[in-house]
């Protein structure tokens, strides 16, 4: 892609997200979401092949349907209340429609159908943007709507997302699809805690983005996209394999890694609000995710295929630009748990 065109696309993507996040007016927030959607399409089609074209078409059709539903909800709210304020959507029909539209944009169940297919059809870098950056704008709107949303609809979507995210990833062999189902599951955790403590939703989103960025950067550096290529990682890059193993354990929420912190705080918050059955159900369903994370760890780290190469280290390196981004992300992804008391005091 032309560097000038790419810089323009990325700038517009950044501007669309920031417009939505800083807006308190529904019309400008909707415009930011549309800028976000339209600039994401050429990013998904960075490589022109039938699969990426199909993925971009699916993404456009789903997001356009969600945008149309959101605009219909805003029009209904305007007819009844006469205002465009995000924090004052008083009509229950409009509120539920807007909530479902934003859930579709987030890719939470039962509106998740497009996420695995689109993620699998594109390269790793567009998939990384899709599963991380594209969550910011819709979640910022849900954060502002948290006081008057339909909690039953949020709980239903959250529990379904955790269940489908764990269940759908069990029989997958493609890493992008596994990470897509992992994203659906994490969206469920964020949605359920949203009515109780929106700050914990932001904490969970921050740690999820750090973990997902780390995994995608490792997979991009090692050119790994499937379980079969994952089995060769230990022979080629042992250090990267160990980093991938610890990051996957953190993504599954295993102590004493960073991913355990948001789950711990969310379960504590739910039990503090006299909700016992829901956190217990969430913790049990999260074991499904932990199973396929352990499956990835087994294939990458605990299985070494027979090899005729006696050299344990790579002797010929490609010319890559060294960066501090990945080590920093890996450190943050695995070592933030001791900060839990300080973070819980800031809530």
Swiss-Prot record:
<feature type="transmembrane region" description="Helical">
    <location>
        <begin position="3"/>
        <end position="23"/>
    </location>
</feature>
<dbReference type="GO" id="GO:0005743">
    <property type="term" value="C:mitochondrial inner membrane"/>
</dbReference>
<dbReference type="InterPro" id="IPR010933">
    <property type="entry name" value="NADH_DH_su2_C"/>
</dbReference>
<keyword id="KW-0812">Transmembrane</keyword>
<feature type="transmembrane region" description="Helical">
    <location>
        <begin position="178"/>
        <end position="198"/>
    </location>
</feature>
<keyword id="KW-1133">Transmembrane helix</keyword>
<dbReference type="InterPro" id="IPR050175">
    <property type="entry name" value="Complex_I_Subunit_2"/>
</dbReference>
<keyword id="KW-0472">Membrane</keyword>
<feature type="transmembrane region" description="Helical">
    <location>
        <begin position="150"/>
        <end position="170"/>
    </location>
</feature>
<keyword id="KW-0520">NAD</keyword>
<comment type="subunit">
    <text>Core subunit of respiratory chain NADH dehydrogenase (Complex I) which is composed of 45 different subunits. Interacts with TMEM242.</text>
</comment>
<keyword id="KW-0999">Mitochondrion inner membrane</keyword>
<feature type="transmembrane region" description="Helical">
    <location>
        <begin position="93"/>
        <end position="115"/>
    </location>
</feature>
<keyword id="KW-0679">Respiratory chain</keyword>
<feature type="transmembrane region" description="Helical">
    <location>
        <begin position="199"/>
        <end position="219"/>
    </location>
</feature>
<dbReference type="GO" id="GO:0008137">
    <property type="term" value="F:NADH dehydrogenase (ubiquinone) activity"/>
</dbReference>
<dbReference type="GO" id="GO:0032981">
    <property type="term" value="P:mitochondrial respiratory chain complex I assembly"/>
</dbReference>
<dbReference type="Pfam" id="PF06444">
    <property type="entry name" value="NADH_dehy_S2_C"/>
</dbReference>
<dbReference type="GO" id="GO:0006120">
    <property type="term" value="P:mitochondrial electron transport, NADH to ubiquinone"/>
</dbReference>
<keyword id="KW-0813">Transport</keyword>
<keyword id="KW-0496">Mitochondrion</keyword>
<comment type="function">
    <text>Core subunit of the mitochondrial membrane respiratory chain NADH dehydrogenase (Complex I) which catalyzes electron transfer from NADH through the respiratory chain, using ubiquinone as an electron acceptor. Essential for the catalytic activity and assembly of complex I.</text>
</comment>
<feature type="transmembrane region" description="Helical">
    <location>
        <begin position="242"/>
        <end position="262"/>
    </location>
</feature>
<comment type="similarity">
    <text>Belongs to the complex I subunit 2 family.</text>
</comment>
<dbReference type="Pfam" id="PF00361">
    <property type="entry name" value="Proton_antipo_M"/>
</dbReference>
<keyword id="KW-1278">Translocase</keyword>
<dbReference type="InterPro" id="IPR001750">
    <property type="entry name" value="ND/Mrp_TM"/>
</dbReference>
<keyword id="KW-0249">Electron transport</keyword>
<feature type="transmembrane region" description="Helical">
    <location>
        <begin position="326"/>
        <end position="346"/>
    </location>
</feature>
<protein>
    <recommendedName>
        <fullName>NADH-ubiquinone oxidoreductase chain 2</fullName>
        <ecNumber>7.1.1.2</ecNumber>
    </recommendedName>
</protein>
<keyword id="KW-0830">Ubiquinone</keyword>
<feature type="transmembrane region" description="Helical">
    <location>
        <begin position="274"/>
        <end position="294"/>
    </location>
</feature>
<dbReference type="GO" id="GO:0045271">
    <property type="term" value="C:respiratory chain complex I"/>
</dbReference>
<feature type="transmembrane region" description="Helical">
    <location>
        <begin position="59"/>
        <end position="79"/>
    </location>
</feature>
<dbReference type="GO" id="GO:0072593">
    <property type="term" value="P:reactive oxygen species metabolic process"/>
</dbReference>
<dbReference type="InterPro" id="IPR003917">
    <property type="entry name" value="NADH_UbQ_OxRdtase_chain2"/>
</dbReference>
